[in-house]
Amino acid sequence: MRQYLDLCQRIVDEGVWLENQRTGKRCLTVINADLTYNAAANEFPIITTRKSYWKAAIAEFLGYIRGYDNAADFRKLGAKTWDANANENQAWLNNPVRKGVDDMGRVYGVQGRAWRKPNGETVDQLRKIVDDLSRGIDDRGEILTFLNPGEFDLGCLRPCMYSHTFSLLGDTLYLTSYQRSCDVPLGLNFNQIQVFTFLALMAQITGKKPGQAYHKIVNAHIYEDQLDLMRDVQLKRRPFPSPRLEINPDIKTLEDLETWVTLDDFNVVGYECHEPIKYPFSV
């Protein structure tokens, strides 16, 4: 929690104002942020200086694991995070490849589970990683990437957190996640939960021990209409200790994650937080 607040304070103190063409808003911006999450000690990196809706964050990433491309499927899991980008993004609404209401296109999990090859076949990146790690194999290329520049025009949004690299040291699994852009008041709240949970889940289904998760952000920013709430409200609050994440031990395979797992299979223990803060969201 402290490293999150330190990043927020750094943006407030050192950030440079940049115009964002997509949203039409200014962003207070810093370049390069490195966060580390201790999955080995189960120190769940959830924000405590305001209420964090952790279930939606996990539900969203579960949708990525399943390769979903429709906002309705994410809503069924418990995440409404794709409603706006699928249905209110004017550039996407005008795109002739859009299939209709709630269609997201070839974004995130679609690339992770069905990356297109020139011959028309697809690559299941996640399946390969799970199979390798389960056999104790780390070929130094256990990489799940959602970033496919050749298909940017086939989706409603370029991936922000776009790549996840798994590494094995003995029987301990590590994760390094890369993010090109981060809305720190809103997006990082979700992203840090997702990085931690992804490592914990992958360790569980491959029979490994979770180690550290390393989260690398390039462009970290606070939108101009979020700044007052961050500087004058959230940064004035004292954080609470980190809670723990409990995952149903019956989750043992990738197929489990693809089929029957729901939010009922996750629980956060010992979570204390301050009152919610409603930050504006930029589409």
UniProtKB/Swiss-Prot annotation:
Transmembrane segments: none annotated. GO terms for molecular function: thymidylate synthase activity. Pathway: Pyrimidine metabolism; dTTP biosynthesis. Its EC number is 2.1.1.45. InterPro entries: Thymidate_synth/dCMP_Mease, Thymidate_synth/dCMP_Mease_dom, Thymidate_synth/dCMP_Mease_sf, Thymidylate_synthase. It is an enzyme of class 2 (transferase). Coiled coil: none annotated. Belongs to the thymidylate synthase family. Bacterial-type ThyA subfamily. HAMAP family: Thymidy_synth_bact. Homodimer. This is Thymidylate synthase. It comes from Actinobacillus succinogenes (strain ATCC 55618 / DSM 22257 / CCUG 43843 / 130Z). The gene is thyA.
